[in-house]
Amino acid sequence: SVLLLEGQCVLGGLATSGLVNYWVPLCNGRGKYIIRGMAQELLRLSLAHSFNTLYPDWKQGEPDHETTQRSDTWFSGGMFSLALLKLLKDEGVEILYNALVSAPVMEGKHCKGVIIDGKSGRRFYPCRVLVDASGDASIMKQAGVPVTDGTNYFTYYGEGITLGGCRAAVEKKNIFLAYYHPYGGAANLHGQFQPEGKPPYMGCDMETINQYLQENQLRMYEKESGNCGMEQNIHTLPGIPQLRTARRIRGNATLTGEDCYRHCDTSIGTICDFEFRDRLYEVPYGVLVKDGFDNLITCGRSASASGWGWDVLRVIPPAVLTGQAAGIAAALAIAQDVPIADVPIEKLQKALADTGVIIHFDDSWVPREEADDGHAASKDHI
């Protein structure tokens, strides 16, 4: 049985209540899907009852010809949250909303379960395997798994609507055009537009999160208070901090930018690079686990990666891939009665490959040299 503990009141985390409802490319920038399996399944689910901003070559799925258009798209975070709930309930997953995980209960390095705080008070939920999908390794850290804090720039946005956008939406019959993003800080992931002299936010403790939220919200108020009224309005602020690289584990393996085009025997899947065409990485299983912690595993933004490797691994498509791998690994660990770090890698790879995941990239996809058009930053990604 599976119990999903959700601290918010909707599913999806940063991709939904966090308003980062944007798929970076799943493709190599040449017309080929690289990130497959559950990532493709959830991409289709997110667009089933939603607007999209797919380029023409990707409107009907993977094109039958080479293209430099990339497969990125915005989607409705609200509808995706609802669709995720329907999917999980249909699969028999038990979901507990508004359940704040306070602490893991440890016996040495073995997790007996977690304590949650909710409207009915404090409760204990036992577990055989625990997957930390918090995005900031909060459970892993409290359990004693070594972690590294990340840095985040002055970036924060909400969602609003304008009458001008509504007119365009009516004319083009496209509701997406009605929306706009009001910003607090507007720095990008490389630190461009970071205010001079302002240091990045380090980690994700309570003080840092409050500093980040309050500074950004006040900056947004300064920017928007003279604009909002009868013709323009902010209708949603993010429900969680929009911290991309808050904290990650120091796992049995660490993905870095130097791993580009390197094969890995313990790969759980091939991923692409949202800022560069062609670049490929095989994700080692070890980025999700740490020896000695026999029933703890993580995924998504808190997987073990550093430098550019962390940026490549943290975004939605690779996060889905590592989440899929973590779930399968948890089931294998229980079925095989082995520590989570020691699951048979061949069985894990086969289970992933059976869903379409590309475990090892084809060497023919590797260019002999960096192409002139290799840099292809996703236009809407921050």
Stretches with model-predicted labels:
Residues 1-4:
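N-terminal Rossmann-like FAD-binding beta1-loop-alpha1 element of flavoenzymes
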Residues 7-103, 107, 148, 157-158, ...:
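Conserved N-terminal/central alpha/beta ligand/cofactor-binding core
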Residues 14-16, 38, 42, 61, ...:
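Flavin (FAD/FMN)-binding glycine-rich loop and adjacent Rossmann-like elements that form
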Residues 87-94, 115, 132-135:
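N-terminal glycine-rich phosphate/pyrophosphate-binding loop and immediately adjacent elements
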